[in-house]
Each structure stands twice: as structure tokens, then as C-alpha cells.
């Protein structure tokens, strides 16, 4: 009779070949996943980098010039761009208002602004500046934004308007829109003859 002799279990992981195969499999899968993540990351980096440098005709400066020639740059707003000697272009877009436009908004002492503008309607900007959250004092210089009549300290709202072309509270643009034509001028009123009954 042929009897196979099975060695007794020693309990040590290095002598057990089944456990050794499981460990090798786990290490192999971990290394494979790590290599896959690295490959995807490097490939996406190089593809993005080559895509940016492959299209020199659509630089931000070219797009800015196209927008300016189309007339999409609103009046009273500025854009600045800086170019270095290398092939990279740095564009800084400042969409705020020009200094001339900002200085054109009413600026007066708080006492006068409160009487002239704020008593018409009670709002959150009548007693304190929404930017610095400080209460207005009688002699504080206040800038009043047109259309919404919100009040702000002039030294608080002027830097805001240089960067943003809208009111900090309601986001209304203080600039007149380019297409402000009354409807009556475009479509005349139609008149129906009145019928006596």
C-alpha cells in the first residue's frame, strides 16, 4: 500500500508555501496598482503640457485682442497683461472699474449722505459699512453707488471697485448697460381707436 506522508504543520509562515503565494500575490497587486496610478498621472501631465505649448495661436493675449476688437470689453473696465522674453505669457485681467469712473460716483460726508439717500429706504448699509463693518461717524466720507444707493466708506469701496465692477452688497453694476434704450423708442405705442358704446 502506498501511503503519502504529510509533514506536520509547523506554524511558521516561511515554511507554509500556501501562505507564501498569498503574500507574493498581494505584493504584486500593490506594485501593479502603484505603477498604474503613476503611469496615469505622468501621462496626463505630459499630455496637458504638450497641449498648452502646441497651440501658440490661441494665447490669452490673442483671445483678449479678439474680445477687445469685438467690443466685449465694457467701457470703464481695464485689462493688464505682462509678457516676458520667454515663450510663456502671463496675463492678469483686472475687470474692475477705472479710477475716473470710481471718482465720478458721489462722495459726501455721512450726515449729508444719510439725509440725501438712505432715508428713502432703510437698508443694511445705512448705519455701517458692509465692507469693514464699522459704524459710520458724522464726518466719515461716504461713497454712494448709483442705481442701488448703497453707502460705503470711500476708502473701503474704492479698492473693491478697482477689482470688481459691481456693488459689494447687491452685485448691481454701477455702470450703465450699453443697450439702455427705452422700449418706447424701439417699438412705438400702438393706438387703437376708441369706440363709443
Curated annotation (Swiss-Prot):
Enzyme Commission no: 2.3.2.27
Transmembrane segments: 20-40
Cellular compartments annotated: Membrane
Pathway: Protein modification; protein ubiquitination
Primary localization: membrane
GO terms of biological process kind: protein ubiquitination
Gene3D superfamilies cross-referenced by the UniProt entry: Zinc/RING finger domain, C3HC4 (zinc finger)
Top-level taxon: Eukaryota
GO CC, alphabetical: membrane
Keywords, ordered alphabetically: Membrane, Metal-binding, Transferase, Transmembrane, Transmembrane helix, Ubl conjugation pathway, Zinc, Zinc-finger
UniProt GO MF annotations: transferase activity; zinc ion binding
Catalytic activity: S-ubiquitinyl-[E2 ubiquitin-conjugating enzyme]-L-cysteine + [acceptor protein]-L-lysine = [E2 ubiquitin-conjugating enzyme]-L-cysteine + N(6)-ubiquitinyl-[acceptor protein]-L-lysine
Residue segments, region Disordered: 53-80
InterPro entries from the UniProt entry: ATL71-like, Znf_RING, Znf_RING/FYVE/PHD
Annotated Pfam families: zf-RING_2
Membrane topology: Single-pass membrane protein
ZnF endpoints (RING-type): 129-171
Comment field on protein domains: The RING-type zinc finger domain mediates binding to an E2 ubiquitin-conjugating enzyme.
PANTHER family cross-referenced by the UniProt entry: RING-H2 FINGER PROTEIN ATL71-RELATED, TRANSCRIPTION FACTOR C2H2 FAMILY-RELATED
Family: Belongs to the RING-type zinc finger family. ATL subfamily.
Protein name per Swiss-Prot or TrEMBL: Putative RING-H2 finger protein ATL71
Organism: Arabidopsis thaliana (Mouse-ear cress)
